[in-house]
UniProtKB/Swiss-Prot annotation:
The active site is at E346 (proton donor), H377, K492. It holds the Pfam family PGI. The lineage of its organism: Bacteria, Pseudomonadati, Chlamydiota, Chlamydiia, Chlamydiales. This is Glucose-6-phosphate isomerase. It is found in: Cytoplasm. One of its GO terms (molecular function) is monosaccharide binding. The gene is pgi. NCBIfam families: PRK14095.1 (NF010695). HAMAP family: G6P_isomerase. GO terms for cellular component: cytosol. Its EC number is 5.3.1.9. It comes from Chlamydia trachomatis serovar A (strain ATCC VR-571B / DSM 19440 / HAR-13).
Amino acid sequence: MGKGFLDCESLVALQEMALHPIDLTASGCLSEERIQKNSLSAEGFTYSYATERVDDRCLEALQGLTEERELIKQMECMQQGAIMNRIEGFQSESRPVLHTATRAWVRDQDLHEEAAAIARHSKEEALRLAEFLYIARAKFSTLVQMGIGGSELGPKAMYFAMQGSCPSDKRIFFVSNIDPDNAAEVLREIDLEQTLVVVVSKSGTTLEPAANEELFRQAYQNKGLSIAKHFVAVTSQGSPMDDKSRYLEVFHLWDSIGGRFSATSMVGGVVLGFAFGYEAFIEFLQGAAAIDAHALTPKMRENLPLLSAMLGVWNRNLLGYPTTAVIPYSTGLKYFTAHLQQCGMESNGKSISREGKEISFRTSPIIWGDVGTNCQHSFFQSLHQGTDIVPVEFIGFLHNQRGLDCVLSGSSSSQKLFANLVAQSLALAQGRDNANSNKRFKGNRPSSILVAQQLSPRIAGSLLAFYEHKFAFQGFCWGINSFDQEGVSLGKELATQIIGIMSGNAPVEFPEARGMLRLFNVLT
């Protein structure tokens, strides 16, 4: 849609500006006026980008780029069910992208055709979930969720995000890795009779959950317990797992819901509803749905995910920074960056356009990070004085979740936490001169700060959707398909062949793999 990324007139202007971006170390640069002007408050968040290397001219050009690339129109098309997961002229999944429809039913929205159908089915599944939870929460004390990728990362991140603000007497575990030690660790911790096992696989054939399900089924058989009374499936209709004779209950999702965008479907619904109750899950959906609507705001400087996306494009494509660090100053978000790695890098780590052509510019940065203040004492040395400049996205909250705090030396721990967040952003931006070169901080290291009052279920849902839409906007801008993941398939295909060699049933010759296996089998 619109002009190609490299054909945009705004990009030419931005390239000129990138030669001499604003100097954040200049005296008076971070004035009160700039701080107030370069901020946006919406949907329970305040977003500060005064410490990014942008000025009004740059922001106007970025707005122009959003218009030339028709980003809002593309977002509208996505939410209404257009075929956004496609590569023109080549075999591809050719599907709509409708994770937003899984939460659209909690607010009034005029949806078309398949989007309306997915919203309707999502409501039906949610109502079935409410009935199921009424019985399951009374009967079971523990839940184990089995899944890989988006079937684990998003739900796990959101479970821990909500854990501090939602009282719960339930124990939750996640099993994802095909490494049997992962399953063994969890089996040691649980009472099988009190445990509900949720197996998540859209296709019903995913290797990792299939292997782990078999390990758990064997454990239940060895205990003489009924498997069908303890196991729940979340899968597509008609998949091999869509079998009520093998499961206590089967919940459904659809082809148009990508794994990394599935936390607001039953992929996240069963575990979050079991852990915190159905109402907490609905609050979570409401937060996500609010950002879905907000993401359609036309003006970039009034649209949280669009603004963040375009600042990311500026940092990646114009200033040339290869990585982005996401640093939440919240223990509840300790698994959130891992989810963002998948959501961002699996979506936009592409080198082919939607027209099937090789592209000649940078796409997704490497996304990484950890929880503050912990990481201030590990990799922040490199952020401040290393040879690579790393844009940082700080996330913070004014109040902690659990209510426990103390005052030491005149300030609470929550105040100290937030003070450190702000201090790091300013230190990166302004730096500090010193005659001792070892103590010199050059500054001009960009960052942004996203703050909410407290990490609640609603804010967790909004934060999830904020980043989903940020990455979608960036993919739209670059003209790539953010909704497939062909890069996952080659390694899986080769692994299947190597498993055949190891089991003595190799379907094809694979001398390189045999050579590798001979090298390492010497250790046995």
